Every structure is written in C-alpha cells, then in structure tokens.
C-alpha cells in the first residue's frame, strides 16, 4: 500500500495477496469440512462466491474427503468463504488506516475527495470495495486491470528507488 507525496512513496507492506486468500479458503475447508481442495479450486471459489459480505451463493467443488480418503464433491457456501476471508479483509482496512494516518495533511483533502484505490487481482473479490468504504467512509476506486497496476507501480519504483520511504 503506498501514497505518493512530493515524489516520495509512503508505504506499508500488506502481505495479503491472492495466494493468502486461497490458502485461507483451503485451510478453512480442510478444518471445517474435513475436505482437501487444491489451489486452482480455491481460486475458483474465491472468484465465484468470495465476497466481503455473506451472500446466498454456493458452489460445488471436487477434492478429497479426508474421512474416506476418496475423491468427492462438496458444496461450499458463501458463509464458509466469508468466514475464511474476513480476517484478511479487516487486515487490508487496518493497513489502509495506518497509511492514511501517516499521510501529510496537505493531501488528506485530495484523498477525501478522490478516494483510495484497490489494486491487485484480489481487489476483484465481490464487495471488497464496499467493505472498505463501509469501514473507512472514503470513496473506493477499483481499477479496470488491477493486476497490471501492481506491476506498473513496482516498475516505476524500480526505475527510481528514491521514491521509497519504508517504515
């Protein structure tokens, strides 16, 4: 998470990428359902019924039943996925709050007017923007190609390392 001010980037590492969401889903299903799924299945669950708020959606997925040891199919509900991801959603909000608290007052009004941007593939998770808005009261912008914005931002920083101020 970063904030550009006077050609300096204020940043805070948020180690919450798509893989962390997928791992949380895998672990929750294994613990609660005694059922093992792979990373691709977890990604499918996340992008199909993953949401910052509980919905009435569900998805049938294949994996291995840990009780029988056999391949099987199970229905995963939105509440299961939300339970797995809610702590990560809150961690994102907490990290945004920290960087906003460190933002110079000169640009706080710009942030208030323009909002914050969610980037990265996981920003596509349903209602994540609404969750951040509900928690912070700030406009939330979602990028058209969130995966690309992360790469472009890192590229800009690599080209000019003086932009970085890490705390």
Q: What would you call each of these model-derived segments?
A:
Residues 25, 96, 118, 154:
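Residue-level signature of catalytic and energy-coupling elements of molecular machines
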Residues 38, 156-167:
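Acidic, glycine/GT-rich loop-and beta-edge segments that sit at the periphery of enzyme/chaperone cores
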Residues 1-5, 166:
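Short, small-residue-biased leader/transition segments that mark boundaries at the very start
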Residues 7-9, 109-114, 136-139:
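Short, surface-exposed connector motifs at secondary-structure boundaries
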Residues 7-93, 111:
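Phosphate-binding glycine-rich/basic clefts of nucleotide- and phosphate-handling proteins
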Residues 50, 54, 108-132:
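Glycine-rich phosphate-binding loops at beta-strand->alpha-helix junctions
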Residues 84-111, 157-160:
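Phosphate/ATP-binding catalytic cores across multiple sugar-kinase/actin-like superfamilies
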Residues 130-155:
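Conserved phosphate-binding/catalytic loops in two-lobed NTP-binding clefts
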């Amino acid at each position: 998470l970063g904030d550009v001010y006077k050609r300096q980037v204020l940043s805070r590492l948020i180690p919450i990428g798509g893989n962390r969401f997928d791992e949380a889903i895998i672990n929750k299903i294994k613990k609660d359902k005694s059922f093992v799924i792979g990373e691709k299945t977890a990604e499918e669950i996340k992008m199909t019924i993953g949401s910052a708020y509980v919905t009435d959606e569900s998805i049938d997925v294949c994996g291995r039943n840990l009780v029988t040891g056999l391949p099987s199919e199970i229905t995963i509900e939105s509440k299961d996925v939300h339970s797995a991801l809610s702590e990560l959603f809150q961690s994102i909000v907490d990290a945004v709050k920290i960087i906003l608290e460190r933002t110079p007052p000169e640009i706080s009004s710009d942030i208030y007017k323009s909002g914050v941007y969610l980037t990265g593939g996981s920003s596509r998770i349903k209602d994540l923007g609404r969750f951040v808005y509900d928690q912070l009261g700030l406009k939330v912008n979602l990028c058209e190609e969130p995966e690309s914005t992360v790469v472009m931002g890192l590229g800009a920083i690599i080209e000019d390392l003086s932009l970085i101020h890490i705390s």
